């Protein structure tokens, strides 16, 4: 997993920002070092291609956007935040973990899923499989209904 920052600010603004956040102390964080690349997009070419310049918001500022792009260059998640609202990094991390879990195990994650929680197995492909799942719950798997079966996570 790699992280890349994109800003419509200049390279010099990036340098000044990186230096300043190392000097500041906020919410117990200090000497913060950004360990991912920041891309200068002063012409807003990338920001425009990804829809980060929102009508009615600003013609010179990009909205706060998060894109999760998988190794095959497929966009898996897009989150847009208004210019006035900061990102929720805990949620971004949770979504990335959920995508990685789903890809690795062919499962889905339910609402409010956290690592270690039970996951949803794919819906049965036939009536016979659905009936078998409903009748044969196990330590590893259980169903709430024919279409909603879970895999227990080992704790």
PLM feature spans:
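Chalcogenol-based redox active-site neighborhoods
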Residues: 1-155
């Amino acid at each position: 997993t790699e992280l890349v920052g994109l800003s419509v600010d200049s390279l010099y603004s990036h340098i000044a920002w990186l230096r300043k956040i190392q000097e500041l102390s906020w919410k117990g964080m200090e000497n913060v070092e950004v360990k991912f690349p920041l891309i200068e997009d002063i012409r807003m070419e990338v920001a425009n291609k990804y829809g980060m310049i929102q009508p009615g918001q600003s013609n010179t500022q990009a909205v706060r956007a998060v894109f999760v792009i998988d190794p095959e260059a497929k966009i898996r998640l897009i989150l847009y935040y208004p210019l006035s609202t900061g990102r929720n990094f805990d949620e971004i991390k949770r979504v990335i973990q959920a995508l990685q879990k789903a890809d690795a195990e062919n499962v889905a994650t339910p609402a409010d899923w956290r690592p270690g929680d039970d996951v949803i197995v794919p819906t049965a492909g036939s009536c016979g499989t659905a009936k078998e799942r409903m009748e044969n719950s196990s330590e590893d798997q259980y169903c709430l209904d024919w279409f909603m079966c879970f895999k227990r996570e080992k704790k």
